[in-house]
Amino acid sequence: MTGRLLTFADEKPAEPGKRTDEVLVGISPAFADFFSQTITGLSHADVIRQILAGIEEQEVSARIVRVRHSSDLAVVAHTAAKLSGSGIAIGLLSRGTTMIHQRDLPRLSSLELFPQSPLMTLETYRQVGSNAAQYAKGESPEPVPTLNDQMARPRWQAKAALLHLKETEQIVQGAKPVEVIPQFAQALATN
């Protein structure tokens, strides 16, 4: 099977953005590091590509920061939003749970929340990027349409709990966010 691989390079301390036309993407400790795909098997490389494409389509710049001090989505997203020049950020956990946050909102609030990661598609991630970019431009986009499956929670709860435990094991207490640059590669075919 072939697929995309994703690594992050050039880790440097994340600094507050100076551009008012940027969206930060905050990734969790294990994203494209300990884990390489979401709970349903979407590659992290494809997820990041789609989010960045959605941002780029709106002609807004993007940066990515890794938040190592927490595996809580609200903390990841709000930390990134506080560093974003526009005040808008996307938080992204390894299992695929996503949130669009704004710097001046309380940490546990958000502009848009996508809690059912098993229902996220690559198209949804692209729309998340697009909406975040529209918020960064001062627009009020229609919320990204989401699916709702009452059985998703019981069906995926055990796996989600295990993934969260593994993600939490990757936390580095007191670590400051670092800015990272994505590097994409094509995986080799295996038999």
Where are the language model's segments positioned?
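Glycine-rich phosphate/diphosphate-binding loop of Rossmann-like nucleotide-binding domains
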Residues: 9-59
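Active-site rim loops that border cofactor/substrate pockets in soluble metabolic enzymes
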Residues: 48-81
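Conserved active-site and cofactor/substrate-binding residues in soluble primary-metabolism enzymes
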Residues: 1, 42-46, 50, 71, ...
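Short coil/turn connectors at secondary-structure junctions
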Residues: 18-22, 60, 84-87, 180
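Structural signal for hydrophobic packing residues in well-ordered secondary-structure cores
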Residues: 51-59, 84, 88, 132-136, ...
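Glycine-rich, charged/polar anion/phosphate-binding loops
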Residues: 6-12, 74-77
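C-terminal binding/interaction regions
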Residues: 39, 108-191
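Glycine-rich phosphate-binding loop
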Residues: 71-108
